[in-house]
Amino acid sequence: MDGLVAQCSARLLQQEREIKALTAEIDRLKNCGCLEASPSLEQLREENLKLKYRLNILRRSLQEERRKPTKNMININSRLQEVFGCAIRAAYPDLENPPLIVTPSQQPKFGDYQCNSAMGISQMLKAKEQKVSPREIAENITKHLPNNKYIDKVEIAGPGFINVHLRKDFVSEQLTSLLVNGVQLPVLGDKEKVIVDFSSPNIAKEMHVGHLRSTIIGESMSRLFEFAGYDVLRLNHVGDWGTQFGMLIAHLQDKFPDYLTVSPPIGDLQAFYKESKKRFDADEEFKKRAYQCVVLLQSKNPDIMKAWNLICDVSREEFKKIYDALDITLIERGESFYQDRMKDIVKEFEDKGFVQVDDGRKIVFVPGCSVPLTIVKSDGGYTYDTSDLAAIKQRLFEEKANKIIYVVDNGQAIHFQTIFAAAQMIGWYDPKVTLVTHVGFGVVLGEDKKKFKTRSGETVRLMDLLEEGLKRSMDKLKEKERDKVLTEEELKAAQTSVAYGCIKYADLSHNRLNDYIFSFDKMLDDRGNTAAYLLYAFTRIRSIARLANIDEAMLQRAARETKIILDHEKEWKLGRCILRFPEILQKILDDLFLHTLCDYIYELATTFTEFYDSCYCVEKDRQTGKVLKVNMWRMLLCEAVAAVMAKGFDILGIKPVQRM
């Protein structure tokens, strides 16, 4: 319902802009005596009236829906925007698309949220030669606020800021709903299809630190869209085709001549690749055979296909070890999947007159893009450009994707801009209807601020990095003497949770567009915005009820029977922070920057610490340590924090443990 209202509103605004422009043009021409009434203008006016009628019905339906109880968490910011949107439309019905700005307040003295629309509206009125101060506008907006269950009071501050104070009973009810029904977002995706293209290593080469960011960011993004109700297809566009397979297959034939009947023990594929490359560069006869193997591969020769599959399988086994360790889920759909579609792609571009021939190459110039696409090489072979065009068409027409997200490093930005522009040019999709976007990211740097390498200057193998992480996290746990209090099983679980959690969080907590410095020392530090700190904080929160002998059943019963009191300023601050979770996730769904979630989880953990230091959850006898009183509403606040943190961790792909 929300999406339909937004879609209809956007179309209405577009129609109104078109009407305005056409009316001005017609008035100008009429003044010259050139034109009668325009049927095009009348048609637009008629459609606009229909849209306004439909939009009003939708708004009324939405208000009815809002009154019904829901098991999902509420996006409070979004609800306040609806309330202030109604007030602004009622106060200034003649303004076209007035600004609607509602944000959480930065300081308690400014309330819980602020509406800062008055200044922008003042500027719009000034352009219409109406001089009204922002403060007067703010007063007018507040007079037109509809009755609602969210706002306790509003205050006008400074030049025209509207400070919004939420109702305590509303916040308390929302926290109770969260505890009873679990952490559930409003359904946003409505089963729209999202394709996330990420990881994408090359067959016959080991995954290295350069694949880390795409794999981690893509997995987390997929989890977020799934949680928001989208149908997500996670694709691994592996490099499993091309001339390099000719030399690998030729080398396989020489080294394991009976490969068709006996499975070859290739073992170290990286070494195998280097051996074949060395021969390819030094031996002309071998190079010729390698090219012959490429031709046979492209014609799907059965023996060559068997060799190709053997090489791919060895790589897949190596990739799987990393994906299993990091809990990554992917469907492999490599370049080979699109081979049979490429001929038709080239023909379609030729038939529409987009292809030019340059030195035997078939190229496509795309408006607004500096570098043309090469869709056929001078030797008749296809390129990455052809493969990516075939992939985007398959995803749009066969998968019927509503959103396609490519999680690939910043260095590929121009390539993807050109591919997307070419797909629009040929008419495959309309960017107003379908989102096709490149989620770029910076490189991983060493502590010397240069590209992360081994001491010998080689690229860091991803498996080596993960193993080093496991070693470092165990050292850290033993340093804290956790091996003396945890069982062997608990210690192992804590080791993997900290190791992989810290590696993922260190990546995701940085703005993805920036390069980031990889440092085990920093990421394993249990102070500051790190996974180590947050995982420890989570286990501490989970232990509060356990140490007070309160089990899950008691907490569930209390959630239904106990009113959550928010009288202490730290209780109120924590309650509001918990309920901001849906608006944080909505922001990430809009801009695709996951570090916002990390910042929020850290803020939630530090806000909890403030609350816990100021508000007794469990009151004990100082001499005996005996529990005298349990403040159950505060225990419920602890439980709500843990529930939101657990869901945040899940989206980030981090597995917390109960004991650490």
Swiss-Prot record:
Give a single Pfam family match: DALR_1
Matches recorded under InterPro entries: aa-tRNA-synth_I_CS (IPR001412), Arg-tRNA-ligase (IPR001278), Arg-tRNA-synth_N (IPR005148), Arg-tRNA-synth_N_sf (IPR036695), ArgRS_core (IPR035684), DALR_anticod-bd (IPR008909), Rossmann-like_a/b/a_fold (IPR014729), tRNAsynth_Ia_anticodon-bd (IPR009080)
What organism, scientifically named, is this protein from? Mus musculus (Mouse)
Q: What is the lineage of its organism?
A: Eukaryota, Metazoa, Chordata, Craniata, Vertebrata
Q: Mind telling me what this protein is named?
A: Arginine--tRNA ligase, cytoplasmic
Gene name linked to the record? Rars1
- Tell me, in one coarse class, where this protein mainly resides: cytoplasm
Q: Which residues carry this modification: N-acetylmethionine?
A: 1
Q: What is known of its domains?
A: The alpha-helical N-terminus (residues 1-72) mediates interaction with AIMP1 and thereby contributes to the assembly of the multisynthetase complex.
Q: Where is the motif 'HIGH' region annotated in this sequence?
A: 201-212
Tell me the function of this protein: Forms part of a macromolecular complex that catalyzes the attachment of specific amino acids to cognate tRNAs during protein synthesis. Modulates the secretion of AIMP1 and may be involved in generation of the inflammatory cytokine EMAP2 from AIMP1.
